[in-house]
Amino acid sequence: MKILVMIKQVPDTATQVKIGGDGRAIDTAGITWIVSPYDEFAVEEALRIKEKRGQGEVVAVSLGPERTKEALRSCLAMGADRAVHLKDPAWDAGDTLMTARALAAVIKQEAPGLALFGRQAIDDDMGAVAAQVAELLGWPCASWIMEEAVDEAGKTVRVGRQVEGGLEIFDLPLPAVASAQKGLNEPRYPTLKGIMGAKKKEIKEVKASDIGGATEPAALSVVKLESLPPRPPGRVIQGEAAEAAKELVRALREDAKAI
């Protein structure tokens, strides 16, 4: 069984992100990049499916600039067999739908039994690509899954989707799309052997012309990015407890409009 895992390279959560000079994108200078954490759950689950079945192939796929290969190498170090890197200036100003079209085209070429995503990328929190890919392919889709089990015949996958108070259980015919939620598993750390072996594994570079081109322009564009305003300093209320309590209530009601 072949499993494709779509991943995205995002800024490390510990990185101080600044807005670029054009006001429409972040300044990438000095940023540390990582695999989006939710995508790591998807990679881990793909590896577990392969290990449980005793055979198969796990392919990591990502769209982005040259540095995206670092994220793909991380997936190869975890245990993915090979990777596909979608890299073309035609996708530089793309939105989620353009990304979904490109990924769907690769998925059609690869013809996997299962396509896994993280529930959302932590840089934009859009969470749209998995569902868009499923719609473009005409495949069933389950989002935010907390458990999964592929049947022995490789014909269906049973997934548990988190809802308030429990799990919704679905049986999806394969091929299908699913997006991973935190709690699905605990992603493994790459071993030294895995890190060294990743250097020898294939990363296939794909251009827009290889999959039919980026024929439709992005439907969504960023107008402006703004930094959050500085947080106002706290206020210490002095005095006797009774008077301080009255002042606190007044401040919450009249100044903060909190009560």
Say what each PLM segment does.
Residues M1-I259:
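N-terminal glycine-rich FAD/FM-binding segment characteristic of electron-transfer flavoproteins
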